[in-house]
Amino acid sequence: MTSEITNQMASTKLSDASASTLADWKEGLKAPAKDARPQTEDVTATKGLEFEDFFIKRELMMGIFEAGFEKPSPIQEETIPVALTGRDILARAKNGTGKTAAFVIPTLERVNPKISKTQALILVPTRELALQTSQVCKTLGKHLGINVMVSTGGTGLKDDIIRLSDPVHIIVGTPGRILDLAGKGVADLSTCQTFVMDEADKLLSPEFTPVVEQLLGFHPKDRQVMLFSATFPIVVKTFKDKHMNSPYEINLMDELTLRGITQYYAFVEEKQKVHCLNTLFNKLQINQSIIFCNSTNRVELLAKKITELGYSCFYSHARMLQHNRNRVFHDFRNGVCRNLVCSDLLTRGIDIQAVNVVINFDFPKNAETYLHRIGRSGRFGHLGLAINLINWEDRFNLYRIEQELGTEIQPIPQVIEKNLYVYESPENIPRPISSSQRQPGQQQEQDGTVVRNNQGQNPRGNFRGGRGGGGGGQFQGQRRNPPPGQGQPQQGQGMGQVQQPRQNGQQAQRNPQRQPTGPPQA
């Protein structure tokens, strides 16, 4: 069905007169600077369609143009024509290939701003993803006169009730909060024709499935249901058979892991991980990085260690207050800080295009988590680097994840080539417009919200020079197994010791400009 529609659109090209008419509406609109970074085939291998070929509203086209969207990606080419017909869709595509716009554009097109009823509900698993998705809706629909509301847990219910007293056309939120509003009769979903689930594999986990099914009960029976994710476990098939009407299935996953992301591992003892991380910071040319830990306690501890080493760092995890998490996410996305330490809170759908390095300080336990983590780099087909710090206990997970994903994670080489993850003009990376910028070097208290040290950085996000600005550093490749004769390494003590006192009682002094020689041998 999609191929017939898209092929017909591709063959129906506009006349020169029509093309000149279309160009007129662009007058007075300001498109952002073009992103000149190279892209991989999963976003460039299109059928040659333009957004104009979908025959969507002129006002929506204006928002798409001002957002900097040039041509639809493959997932957008496949999804938008079918979604505009109102058919149910089950779409599987890689992280960072344009899934959000694939469902936001047809959703905006089908909403009638003259009807003061909620006409679309977009469910996401996390608060950060809800904020990001709602912003995409507002950006693309800025000329449509559509009201978009984001509603998540962790904020006051009273504020949501007040906002719903005015017309809201699209609600973006997490399942629990939306069910609360619908159950109280505050959110009227009786005329909500579009039901979208992003990161559907997470939303259909045992934690969320009962809530999602209850929410569907508030919708009309002829609603359109669209599910999007990078992975579809068996629970998705069960939901499809029960709640979807002959959905059109789209699968663009010729391989699970993202093209354009180079994956390495370094075998290090637990107590040496911080030193290894310090080496990576000194040797890699990092624009922005996300560092993952497996627990909230380790997130805070590692963030503190990183600031002690003299690097700028934020942290975020699920136990933080929501307004603090929002502030960290907003500032990091706007380039205020180079490094973010977090738990798996930010593995789902978060799109920060400036991130070119992901480091698994703690190796994930399963392939699904690994896939979503490394997908935070290399967004929308750009290049990225994923480095995994592996200890003795992680080796079995490493082998299993390689087998399940059909990929090979290579030992870290002595030299990591810049062309694998570095681009020439970081100042041209698309960033959201920040309403306020902090002054260079500004410190914020370490109150459990953020840990910052902007020393040597441009707070506007143009990270040229300063810490982490070196490139092509020397790394000692690590073996998966310990060297012969050493046996199993001893269990490390926590995260390693930074600035430990010497045996004679004197504090070890560190030269901030010292270049470590490489990760220690396991």
From Swiss-Prot:
Residues 463-475 have a biased composition (Gly residues). It catalyses: ATP + H2O = ADP + phosphate + H(+). GO terms for cellular component: cytoplasmic stress granule; P-body. Gene3D superfamilies: P-loop containing nucleotide triphosphate hydrolases. It is found in: Cytoplasm, P-body. GO terms for biological process: mRNA processing; mRNA transport; negative regulation of translation; P-body assembly; stress granule assembly. Residues 430-446, 453-462, 487-516 have a biased composition (Low complexity). The keyword Cytoplasm applies. Its EC number is 3.6.4.13. Residues 427-522 are annotated as: Disordered. Its main location: cytoplasm. PANTHER family: DEAD-BOX ATP-DEPENDENT RNA HELICASE 50. The lineage of its organism: Eukaryota, Fungi, Dikarya, Ascomycota, Pezizomycotina. Coiled coil: none annotated. It comes from Phaeosphaeria nodorum (strain SN15 / ATCC MYA-4574 / FGSC 10173). ATP-dependent RNA helicase involved in mRNA turnover, and more specifically in mRNA decapping. Is involved in G1/S DNA-damage checkpoint recovery, probably through the regulation of the translational status of a subset of mRNAs. May also have a role in translation and mRNA nuclear export. ATP binds at A93, K94, N95, G96, T97, G98, K99, T100. A motif (DEAD box) lies at residues 198-201. The gene is DHH1. PROSITE patterns: DEAD_ATP_HELICASE, HELICASE_ATP_BIND_1, HELICASE_CTER, Q_MOTIF. The Q motif is unique to and characteristic of the DEAD box family of RNA helicases and controls ATP binding and hydrolysis. Belongs to the DEAD box helicase family. DDX6/DHH1 subfamily. A motif (Q motif) lies at residues 49-77. This is ATP-dependent RNA helicase DHH1.
